[in-house]
């Protein structure tokens, strides 16, 4: 790589040139400088690859996979200028040779950089990934040997209608009952919550039959997801066909993962860890696709060896905002099943179901993790909203003809609106709503008529927060004319022009979202609040004062002074990432005027599946923008899938 350009530059000049062209960040250059200080003889190639590895983390990757990445064209979603290409290393074999012979690189984590096959890690990311893989392996080796007859009788009671067709909810409960970890994945409407409630009934009833009582903790990554699960679990527990004592022993309160692990202000560490584990026999985590590698490592570290972990989520949704795609990696082959014969026999014995169609093959072998993973395959909600379910499946299958057909076939629930950037159709849609899905005008009218009694304000606020979920505008982008920042500004200006909102920062009806955790207030990143008048005593007289109402996972309303909220933003529009864990009656997705690297199949699928009744696509460009997004899959570099399916083996003991 001794080009004329490079020979005239120092290694640092070359990195700075890449930074100035937005191919590296200041942080990436700083890491390379630090490594050069630690090892003055480090080569340019190794320093550059270290900087790129750091840069990859900003895009959600845990490592730099030298086998799958062509640096010149794929690291940044665009081709760098020709003069910059000369600064990049040559062939992958050359990179690997330089790394294998560098004192900065090892295979065991003793150096700042770790090379695992073709994957280059910063040491911390490698250590977290290894910790997660090892913890999963330990839980897979923890077997709960239940007599098949007892388990079968309990499953029959909880699933009395299981017939000739395989009941995958029943299969999921059976698999999760026999090991220290269970993974249940499925799309919206497949009954993930129903399954986990029956699993709780199954495990608690079996424990109480032995004069024990399981300590159960329920959690979700965000406050919104926790609140949704709290509501749905509370309703379904009462319908369980179990003894009253068992039903009373099943908790319905769901907390956030941060609260579960015990946040510590001004610290990235949690109160619960290996030396101070959670007091729980069973931990269930919903919306697990939102969990990044750091959080998963912290969760697993905080569990006692005997604690059973159940992960629940949709493997096809967007991966976590931070680095890693843990749920996607763990469930990568869930649609294939890959069940071994002993698992097939176990399900036949306990559920009476035949899952041999999902047996492993020589080309697709299944290891221990596959034996503890169940994919729910029946959409029970499709009768109520068939269009949304059909569109989601078509997007997930990357089937563009079926995507177009779904919009044509289900015009009552699916809509495509071509828009121009200079018209006001977007604002009109949001203000007026559609059908029985109320828009912003109705919301502001209700905000303008507060109750007269203080004791009525909590219920009023709860109703308004629910009304806020009637419709939600989403975008896959944060910046630019079609990103949430400018969309929120645009909608705010229109509300002001319509005399619905005054020209000031805080006003009744302004919805806001937390952009970072506030441990003192007990509010988490992603929590949504609504600015409302609240009747309070002031100078001995009742007065309406501006406050922000948040609904906590347990349903209580928390009123906060606007001045106490530092990290918030207006949220008439939110990113698709931030919408995860939420459900809206009517979801509207903005697509920009041209394809974008962030627009992927997973993003479109996640946006579609946020809608309960109605989905509207607002297209500022040609239909090809949607086509491009549906055909583009999200890929995150990591080694977890390889570790999970290559190195983990079935326990020597099994409860079959």
Each model region followed by its residue ranges:
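Intrinsically disordered, low-complexity N-terminal extensions of AAA+/P-loop NTPases
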Residues: 1-84
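Interdomain "pre-motor" coupling segment immediately N-terminal to P-loop NTPase/helicase cores
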Residues: 85-147
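N-terminal pre-Walker A segment at the start of P-loop NTPase domains
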Residues: 152-166
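ASCE P-loop NTPase helicase motor core
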Residues: 170-173, 179-406
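Residue-level recognition of short, solvent-exposed, well-ordered loop/turn junctions
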Residues: 304, 507-508, 524, 579
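Conserved helicase motor core of P-loop NTPases
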Residues: 316, 320-512, 518-521
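C-terminal accessory regions
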Residues: 527-541, 545-648
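Single conserved hydrophobic/aromatic residue that forms the stacking wall/gate
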Residues: 647-656
